[in-house]
Regions:
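Intrinsically disordered, glycine/charged-rich C-terminal tails and inter-domain linkers
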Residues: 2-25, 155-252
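Catalytic NTP-binding/metal-coordinating core of nucleotidyl cyclase/transferase enzymes
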Residues: 3, 7-103, 107
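A structural signal for short, well-ordered beta-strand segments and their strand-loop junctions
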Residues: 37, 119-125, 158-162
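Short, electropositive, low-hydrophobicity segments enriched in small/polar residues
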Residues: 46, 131, 144
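A general alpha-helical scaffold signature found inside nucleotide-binding enzyme cores
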Residues: 58, 103, 140-147
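Catalytic core of nucleotidyl cyclases, primarily class III adenylyl/guanylyl cyclases
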Residues: 72-100, 112-141
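Short secondary-structure capping micro-motifs at structural edges
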Residues: 106-110, 134, 144-148
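Catalytic/regulatory signature loops of cyclic-dinucleotide turnover enzymes
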Residues: 115-117, 143-165
């Protein structure tokens, strides 16, 4: 047999083997899931301005701990997965976890504000998504929608609750009672009211907590420093100051 014939035989054998192995691999499919994207504000500027890599890694690790601790029960049940991308997180959960996921997102937002003195915003939606077997890659239109909502519509330190969720979940199954419509008609998770009620925090205790944790300083200075040079930044702090005012907590 000529060398050319041998080569053609090898190619044919390789193609046959490849076809057979491909047939054994199930095709990946999109599934309907809840998808949240949350992201801290001003972290990019901190990374640009800081030459201390250890400081940035410490912040990232702290954020990861908040998410890991809040999600651990649903992760253990195989009903939730998450992926950290820099200072942002994609969280994917089963549709029947809508109430638990809302609570998880509120807890994370509270911890980021009070224990890391950072603002967080995001979006929660539902739709088609697919994750790799090792959970290191997430794709799908629902993730794109959550990311777009956070970057284009959230604006303030709030986590939006998409109307699309009700296309996948019956309205009477959504019993989380801390959904609030903002002045621009977007629905968001009222994490302050949720945590105040859950922890039974009094107004006096909350005022003390805001002072001792540095949150009051963060918001007041963030607003006053930016009101003249960057209204876009000032309004983020101002929005949260106004939310505290709704619960009789005057910061400015």
């Amino acid at each position: 047999m000529s060398d050319k014939s041998k080569i053609m035989e090898w190619i044919a054998e390789a193609e046959t083997t490849a076809d057979a192995s491909t047939m054994d691999i199930p095709k990946r499919a999109y599934n309907d899931r809840l998808v949240a994207w949350i992201d801290t504000l001003a972290m990019r500027n901190k990374m640009r301005e800081s030459d201390d890599a250890e400081e940035i890694f410490t912040i990232m690790g702290r954020l990861q701990n908040y998410v890991e601790n809040a999600c651990e029960n649903l992760v253990a049940k195989g009903k939730l997965n998450y992926l950290q991308i820099s200072d942002g997180f994609i969280i994917v959960a089963d549709l029947d976890c809508v109430n638990e996921l809302c609570e998880i997102l509120c807890q994370i937002q509270w911890q980021v504000l009070f224990y890391s003195q950072m603002l967080l915003r995001g979006a929660l939606t539902a739709g088609k998504v697919s994750m790799s077997d090792d959970s290191k890659l997430i794709i799908g239109p629902a993730f794109i929608e959550a990311f777009a909502m956070e970057s284009e519509n959230a604006i303030f330190p709030r986590i939006l609750f998409a109307n699309e969720i009700k296309d996948y979940i019956k309205e009477d199954e959504i019993v989380f009672s801390y959904l609030k419509k903002d002045s621009d008609h977007f629905i968001y998770l009222d994490f302050l009211k949720y945590m105040i009620d859950k922890e039974q925090i009094t107004t006096k205790e909350l005022k003390h907590f805001l002072q001792t944790q540095g949150v009051k300083r963060l918001l007041v200075e963030g607003y006053s420093k930016n009101i003249l040079k960057s209204k876009h930044l000032a309004q983020k702090h101002g929005w949260l100051i106004a939310r505290f005012a709704e619960y009789k907590i005057k910061l400015s």
